[in-house]
Amino acid sequence: MSLMQFSGLLVVWLLSTLFIATLTWFEFRRVRFNFNVFFSLLFLLTFFFGFPLTSVLVFRFDVGVAPPEILLQALLSAACFYGVYYVTYKTRLRKRVVDVPRKPLFTMNRVETHLTWVILMGIALVSVAIFFMHNGFLLFRLHSYSQIFSSEVSGVALKRFFYFFIPAMLVVYFLRQDSKAWLFFLVSTVAFGLLTYMIVGGTRANIIIAFAIFLFIGIIRGWISLWMLVAAGVLGIVGMFWLALKRYGLNVSGDEAFYTFLYLTRDTFSPWENLALLLQNYHNIDFQGLAPIVRDFYVFIPTWLWPGRPSIVLNSANYFTWEVLNNHSGLAISPTLIGSLVVMGGALFIPLGAIVVGLIIKWFDWLYELGNREPNRYKAAILHSFCFGAIFNMIVLAREGLDSFVSRVVFFLVVFGASLLVAKLLFWLFDSAGLIHKRTTSLPQAQVEGKL
């Protein structure tokens, strides 16, 4: 890459970043937080944060990358995607009407809410315990990270249930919403994330998500400033780099440490070059249509229920890894959101996907506002827990693609909804048995004496 080509890419990158960052800043000033703000920051991180890292790798370490015209296509496709997404998100589909009282779809009381978070926590802890009994601490047993996907590891399906510890702790926080509950959420979820990191063999998702939710709650409540958020972000990047070194068993120093930091940070937070690789091999892609979305559900179907279930799930990530890159190392390479759309339908699917994503984020913001307006604090805690709990799925959406997002959000919805139903059933059984008693609030002694 020549300096002239780099200069052209830099101009496009600066204009695109300024465009998205400006819209995000205006939205932040208007509402402080909603899921449009979160997705916009996530989109910036995924598709634009990696460009400076790639530039240093190219000019400092002479690392090979895709041709400049392909990198330009990747940057422009990301900017155009966001433009279509933003217009879709801001377009009102129907006239705003004055809220009229309507019968709620469901309601929650104190006992049902506490039962819900206990059930969610139980699902996570029992899954971790069973996985640990089968495999022990994989971080200290396996020689490479790719081995966690091999036949040496049993009960892999249980990992999908670990994440429900975070929604459980979110319910606990939203019932109190003070600084102590906020700090308790951080300590409990990060401790659980470190435990799963050691048990699973290097999976950092639970730690990243817990830390991100903690920061956004702090921004919403005004407990941390934007500068503190930036400082925490830098700390998070360094922390994720250290965990990655431990995961891959790397011992580096000097220039090698700097080089390793650059490419691991880029691959962890901003796999934008994967989109460039996909566009570079555009002519080799056999467009898959909506099949990757259907196939991604296969992993949630146990073999005892479907004995003939395909052992290889050809979702967009696996198609990109195996068929496009011819990489059979055992790890799936993230195609990114835009890359998954290209795999499914080529360039035509990029604006269509942007419209779909705009509607998805609009729905989550509607649900979030519903929780903000809800007078029943127990129901509000459940709604907010569901919305913030889905942050993991939004990260999957940006990094892995639309197919992975759809299957995971449906799974999350089913498990979360089933926990609610079980909590309501248990409450009905306890109430029928006479085990539920109304809480009586006693008046302070001074007020009692004043009434005598």
UniProtKB/Swiss-Prot annotation:
Going by the UniProt record, its keywords in alphabetical order are: Cell inner membrane, Cell membrane, Membrane, Transmembrane, Transmembrane helix
Its topology with respect to the membrane?
A: Multi-pass membrane protein
GO CC terms: plasma membrane
Disulphide-bonded residues:
none
Q: Where in the cell is it found?
A: Cell inner membrane
Q: Where are the transmembrane segments?
A: 6-26, 37-57, 63-83, 118-138, 155-175, 181-201, 207-227, 228-248, 341-361, 378-398, 410-430
Q: Name one GO biological process term.
A: enterobacterial common antigen biosynthetic process
* Pathway(s) of this molecule: Bacterial outer membrane biogenesis; enterobacterial common antigen biosynthesis
Q: Coiled-coil segments, which residues?
A: none
Which family does the entry's similarity section mention? Belongs to the WzyE family.
* Function recorded in the entry: Probably involved in the polymerization of enterobacterial common antigen (ECA) trisaccharide repeat units.
Checking NCBIfam families in the record gives:
PRK02975.1
Quaternary state and partners of this protein?
A: Probably part of a complex composed of WzxE, WzyE and WzzE.
Q: Could you tell me what this protein is called?
A: Probable ECA polymerase
